């Protein structure tokens, strides 16, 4: 049940944001094999001066269309992560017109004890999930 946070520069319309979220979710479902219904996404829009993402010497040309995806998820294999990165870059460019130069992804891994979906319970630990 990955939790995805999208940080973008403010000013995107609702339709383009929804397409971004839908496209990223489909890539995650395919790369990680999570159920379609497991969808947890947060969008945070920032003024341009609040997102300072330099190219780290890799030659990226960042624009106002920059997207940072921060994911919290249980452990995944390197090949699953590489597949996700490739699918995101390919599909966001094709469907959302977001250049691969404008995509940054970070994954933080956690375990079953690190999730509560409500009611003060750890559903992965108590067998409800």
From Swiss-Prot:
Q: Which InterPro entries match?
A: Tauto_MSAD, Tautomerase/MIF_sf
Q: Which GO terms describe its molecular function?
A: isomerase activity
Keyword vocabulary terms for this entry: Isomerase
State the EC number(s).
Answer: 5.3.2.-
UniProt key word Isomerase: yes
Plastid as a keyword of this entry, yes or no, is no
Active site per the UniProt annotation: 2 (proton acceptor)
Question: Which domain of life, per UniProt?
Answer: Bacteria
Family membership noted in the UniProt record: Belongs to the 4-oxalocrotonate tautomerase family.
| Stated name of the protein | Probable tautomerase YolI
Organism listed in the record: Bacillus subtilis (strain 168)
Q: Which gene encodes it?
A: yolI
